[in-house]
Amino acid sequence: MVATCLQVVGFVTSFVGWIGVIVTTSTNDWVVTCGYTIPTCRKLDELGSKGLWADCVMATGLYHCKPLVDILILPGYVQACRALMIAASVLGLPAILLLLTVLPCIRMGHEPGVAKYRRAQLAGVLLILLALCAIVATIWFPVCAHRETTIVSFGYSLYAGWIGAVLCLVGGCVILCCAGDAQAFGENRFYYSSGSSSPTHAKSAHV
């Protein structure tokens, strides 16, 4: 029963974390920047936000973004962080699909428990790789951006990335280390067989 609960916890945690990584990848509020001194920006009420795909200006009644489409003039760290976040988002899809197939409520024919166990281990590895890509990108980007401009604060995109990466890392570790062995994956299923006393007699394996 404990292994079953940990499998579900690992799946839910990883799924929520993956959504956070996707939000971070697709939004541009990574860091809040200031083109002047911080007191001047606050007095003018003019701040900027910088992300992977656009630089934005936020002022009273104005929000304008300039897409970063010219790859040749983009800083190397922006391109590298783009690649890392895209890789993290893509890795999450097969990891979540694999975790779906190993949940206790899902049964694919009469497959042995070792097959589910191997899929769970692969999903756990993918989730840890996802988390590492997101962690590197969300730390590297603000450090390098600080060298180019004054950073006032971190944006919600960066916080979503940190939370998502940690959740994926926790979910992957739970799946790899705590969700049981091949025997546990084989026992966490329910099946039905006909009994002599009634036409439909439910029988369940020990969990």
Swiss-Prot record:
Database matches in Pfam families: PMP22_Claudin
Q: Which domain of life is it from?
A: Eukaryota
Q: How does it sit in the membrane?
A: Multi-pass membrane protein
Q: Which residues lie on this side of the membrane: Extracellular?
A: 23-82, 144-157
Q: Which GO terms describe its biological process?
A: axon ensheathment; cell adhesion; spermatogenesis; tight junction assembly
- Give its localization: Cell junction, Tight junction; Cell membrane
Picking any one GO molecular function of the record gives: identical protein binding
Ranges in the Cytoplasmic compartment?
A: 1, 104-122, 179-207
* Residues with the Phosphoserine modification: S193, S194, S197, S198
Q: GO CC annotation: what is one?
A: axon
NAD as a keyword of this entry, yes or no, is no
InterPro entries, per the entry: Claudin, Claudin11, Claudin_CS, PMP22/EMP/MP20/Claudin
Q: Where are the transmembrane segments?
A: 2-22, 83-103, 123-143, 158-178
Q: Per UniProt, which keywords does this protein have?
A: Cell junction, Cell membrane, Membrane, Phosphoprotein, Tight junction, Transmembrane, Transmembrane helix
Against PANTHER family, the record matches this protein to: CLAUDIN
Q: How does it assemble?
A: Interacts with tetraspanin-3/TSPAN3. Interacts with OCLN.
| Role noted for this protein | Plays a major role in tight junction-specific obliteration of the intercellular space, through calcium-independent cell-adhesion activity.
Which family does the UniProt entry place this protein in? Belongs to the claudin family.
**What protein name does the entry list?**
Claudin-11
- This protein's species is Macaca fascicularis (Crab-eating macaque)
